[in-house]
Amino acid sequence: MLRLMPVGDSMTIGSAGEHTWRYRLWQHLRETYGGPFRIVGPREALYDKATNTSDSYEYADPDFPRAHLAGWGEGWQHMTPLIADAVRAHKPDVLLVSLGLIDLGFYTDAEQTAEQARTFIAEARLSNPRIAMALLPVIPNVRADTDPPFAAQVAHFNELLAKTAADLDEPRSPLLLTSTPSAYDVNHDTYDGTHPNASGEHKIAGAFADSLYEAWDLGERYGAGEY
């Protein structure tokens, strides 16, 4: 059985009332993947904006495997200390990783963030030397429109992430740099300039799904009808 673990920040955990891209990808794989699979991880909750806590289960559709390793305001530096134990406990075959925006926005520059990504990869491999990882480039948020230095850091980190994936890729533990979400527009695909609305959820799920299909023949391409 194929086990997938979503790892991410606020764009991955989602907040109360949302479906999340995790749900959209699960729906897609349920229809297109030919074998059994599970979504795994140590957490299940959404973020509750009313209480500023990650303890809500008010999904728009709660009837799906909600497991993940994601957190509101958490980035590479927060997930790196957790990933070895999470991989050991939940035994994912594939990590679906969307991290970096919060790091670049508040904690570390592009070079430091890329170093965290390298450490994260090493830690995951300590628990499973054959783990595969699909890495989503950072999607610039609305801040990039008015803060050129921040936009430059995002672009530089994405270049470093691509180099990291190429440098550390191994046949037994492949690293996949996914495509960027198709035609993603923060003015139309988010509800606040950062966090995905329904169309943004579909586009992030599509970026993972298309890359998993093209690189590893998992499932099928994300259909236009799913948007």
Model feature map: region roles:
Residues 4-5, 11-115:
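Conserved SGNH/GDSL esterase-like catalytic core that processes O-acyl groups on lipids
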Residues 35, 80-89, 167-196:
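N-terminal hydrophobic signal/anchor transmembrane helix of membrane proteins
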Residues 121, 140-179, 198-202:
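Substrate-gating cap/lid alpha-helix
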Residues 12, 26, 30-34, 88-91, ...:
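Sec-exported extracytoplasmic/periplasmic mature domains
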Residues 7, 189-227:
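Histidine-centered active-site loop/cap adjacent to the catalytic His
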Residues 17, 21, 79, 83, ...:
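Stable alpha-helical elements in mature extracytoplasmic
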Residues 1-3, 32-38, 90-96, 128-134, ...:
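Loop/turn elements at helix/coil->beta-strand transitions in domains of secreted/extracellular proteins
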Residues 10-14, 43-49, 100-106, 138-144, ...:
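Solvent-exposed loop/turn segments at secondary-structure junctions
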